[in-house]
Design a protein with these regions (language model features):
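Structural preference for solvent-exposed beta-strand-turn elements
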Residues: 1-355
Length: 355
């Protein structure tokens, strides 16, 4: 293999590949990227077995077709240190040579035949969804995905595919986030996508996309990328049962005012006590020491008697920071029962702190 490519092009490709590499054990072939130069195209693959990425470009010169693997992190480190302009990559005797002007580097390679085989979309069901709807939905539910939960299914997000709609859901057991979008699908299936995959999808896809899935994999194609992730095998909680069926009190609140008040309290305490009066909402810190914070905003609530809830401020801010509207709804029942934050097709059910 012998190619010449602009630094900016190969650097950008290698940067996108980094999250997909095995970082801890460099003896594993999954710490390497797979590079194929053929048919006037460069194709690069990276995978840690759980998620994988294919990136390709025809913006290069191929002097000799071929394949090679090389440590993805070290190759990026070398490319980064070089100047802007053309970089030469050439394989000789199972060694990858990287050169530019008077600078020369070489990296050992593994047998490219040992590189993992990627799943293919043929024979899998297809989801018709535009990238904006997908990314917007995933962005809203990402903060509620748990990490390191012994119940593996909670370390991912549910994509509940129905014939006329798709529900995106996540929970860390203290809150539940759900986004519902209208969407046509040929078949129904619920899949659980790992959090790492959810995060990477949001970085990659902005243009037209095609989604394919089965019980084991989710595959996404765009003009620039092909992405896959293994799915989590488990049973996601019955999220529809967690959402309160009836709401006693629904308030319309200003997002900016709420964020400002909550952030003032978080300088002292993560947990905040909120008291709803008839025309005022009071915010107070909940802290074990003698440090206190208190602020209030003017807002007509309709409460005749004070209504108090206590909550982890992060749950409120995560919701407020992902919505685009200037106003949102909060649905309240009793102080110690879950309350609901609403913005259009997005809702978050939050368990309050019992005080």
């Amino acid at each position: 293999m012998k190619i010449t490519v602009q630094k900016s092009i190969i650097e950008n490709i290698l940067i996108h590949a980094q999250p997909f590499l095995e970082k801890k054990d460099t003896s594993q072939i999954t710490s390497h990227v797979f590079i194929d130069a053929s048919n006037n195209r460069l194709t690069l693959k990276a995978t840690d077995y759980e998620i994988g990425l294919i990136v390709s470009t025809d913006n290069l010169i191929i002097s000799q077709d071929g394949n090679v693997t090389a440590n993805g992190k070290k190759l990026l480190d070398i490319v980064r240190i070089l100047k802007e302009g053309e970089i030469n990559l050439e394989v000789k005797s199972d060694i990858l040579y990287i050169s530019q002007s008077h600078s020369k580097f070489k990296l050992p390679t593994f047998s490219y035949n040992e590189f993992p085989v990627f799943p293919v979309s043929e024979g899998k069901s297809r989801i018709l969804i535009n990238s904006h709807s997908l990314i917007d939905s995933l962005k809203k539910i990402t903060p509620s995905i748990d990490i390191n939960n012994p119940k593996f299914e909670l370390n991912g997000a549910l994509i509940d595919i129905k014939q006329n709609s798709i529900n995106f859901a996540s929970t860390d057991t203290r809150r539940l986030a759900v986004v519902n979008i209208d969407n046509q699908s040929a078949s129904e299936l619920s899949i659980i996508v790992p959090k790492k995959a959810i995060v990477e999808i949001q970085k990659l896809f902005f243009d037209d996309i095609e989604l394919y899935y089965d019980e084991n994999y989710l595959i996404i194609h765009s003009k620039e990328y092909t992405f896959f992730t293994k799915l989590i095998n488990g049973k996601f909680p019955e999220y529809s049962r967690i959402i309160p069926k009836e709401i006693k009190n629904t308030l319309i609140l200003q997002k900016a005012k709420m964020i400002e008040a909550i952030k003032q309290i978080t300088t002292i305490s993560t947990d905040v006590k909120i008291t709803f009066l008839n025309d005022t909402i009071i915010f107070e810190s909940l802290s074990d020491d003698n440090i206190e914070a208190k602020t209030e905003i003017n807002s007509i609530t309709g409460f005749v008697t004070p209504f108090i809830i206590a909550v982890n401020s992060r749950y409120l801010l995560d919701f407020l920071n992902t919505i685009n509207s200037s106003e949102f709804n909060i649905g309240l029942n009793d102080s110690n029962l879950p309350f609901v934050l609403n913005d259009g097709n997005f809702k978050t059910v939050v368990m309050p702190i019992v005080i």
